[in-house]
Amino acid sequence: MKQYIFFLALIVLTATFAEAGKKTEILDKVKKVFSKAKDKVLAGVEDLNNMSELGCPFIDKWCEDHCDSKKLVGKCENFDCSCVKLGGK
């Protein structure tokens, strides 16, 4: 979410430079920076997806152990651990 706000702020700054009549060289440099940043973010998302496939069993086990210590049942979904009380007691 913070990344989207950052990119939105940079877009607003870019539009401000364009409205102020700055040279296109500045805009071209900013566009190149945005392009590189976008590529890095997309590469990071790809890496995170690859790591999540490997990390899920460890996180699931941690979640189960964490909730078991509270005498609850653990459910891990999208890296979010939820402890649920089963039964009527």
Curated annotation (Swiss-Prot):
Species whose genome carries this gene: Lychas mucronatus (Chinese swimming scorpion)
Tissue/organ expression: Expressed by the venom gland.
UniProt-recorded Gene Ontology molecular function terms: potassium channel regulator activity; toxin activity
GO terms for cellular component: extracellular region
Cystine connections: 56-76, 63-81, 67-83
Organism lineage: Eukaryota, Metazoa, Ecdysozoa, Arthropoda, Chelicerata
Signal peptide residue numbers: 1-20
Membrane-spanning segments: none
The family this protein is said to belong to: Belongs to the long chain scorpion toxin family. Class 2 subfamily.
BetaSPN-type CS-alpha/beta domain mapped to chain residues: 53-89
Keyword entries, A-Z: Disulfide bond, Ion channel impairing toxin, Neurotoxin, Potassium channel impairing toxin, Secreted, Signal, Toxin
Function: Inhibits voltage-gated potassium channel.
Stored InterPro entries: Long_scorpion_toxin_alpha/beta
Localization of this protein: Secreted
Protein name: Neurotoxin beta-KTx 52.1
Propeptide, chain numbering: 21-39
Pfam family, one: Scorpion_toxin_alpha-beta
